[in-house]
């Protein structure tokens, strides 16, 4: 269950600074974003937000992560590089502070040997929202840390973030 999505915000916000304010409205009309600008001079209150345009957020997430945060594990005799979920979480908080994540489904295989978690990560920029989904599957008999659902969720979360470019270079390093 992998998916891609882009949705324009159907919201209105006002940025006030200096002598005037700029009001910006977003709506979707048949998938096309419409901007409306107006100038206001009443109620001038300086405000600032933490949001940025999606292009800026994605540019930051696509940067190579430092080697110091990369971990390695051996799986089926192969060495695999990865970024722990809690580090991915901190990177998301730093570069996309208004992101959200949600478990979309938890599915056990018919034989009960594996569990798959589908996870969605949504980024909220000043201009739009965008989401990516991915899945993680693990054996219920895996004796490592945590339970199988936690492992599958962490895997799905990391993969969904990689769909935004975060740590994506790890998947291609060996091929270069």
From Swiss-Prot:
Where is it found, in Gene Ontology cellular component terms?
mitochondrion; nucleus
Source domain of life is Eukaryota
Q: What is this protein called?
A: DNA repair RAD52-like protein 1, mitochondrial
Where it sits in the cell: the answer is: Mitochondrion; Nucleus
What the protein does comes down to:
Plant-specific single-stranded DNA-binding protein required for efficient heterologous recombination-dependent DNA repair in nuclear and mitochondrial compartments. Forms large nucleo-protein complexes with WHY2 in mitochondria. Binds ssDNA with high affinity, but with little sequence specificity. Involved in double-stranded DNA break repair. Involved in the hydrolytic splicing pathway in mitochondrion. Facilitates the excision of two cis-spliced group II introns, NAD1 intron 2 and NAD2 intron 1.
Q: Name one GO biological process term.
A: DNA repair
UniProt-listed Gene3D superfamilies: DNA repair protein Rad52/59/22
Does the UniProt entry include the keyword DNA repair? yes
Deletion phenotype: Reduced fertility, increased sensitivity to mitomycin C, and decreased levels of intrachromosomal recombination.
Say yes or no: keyword Amino-acid biosynthesis present. no
Q: Where is the transit peptide?
A: 1-37
Q: Which UniProt keywords apply?
A: DNA damage, DNA recombination, DNA repair, DNA-binding, Mitochondrion, Nucleus, Transit peptide
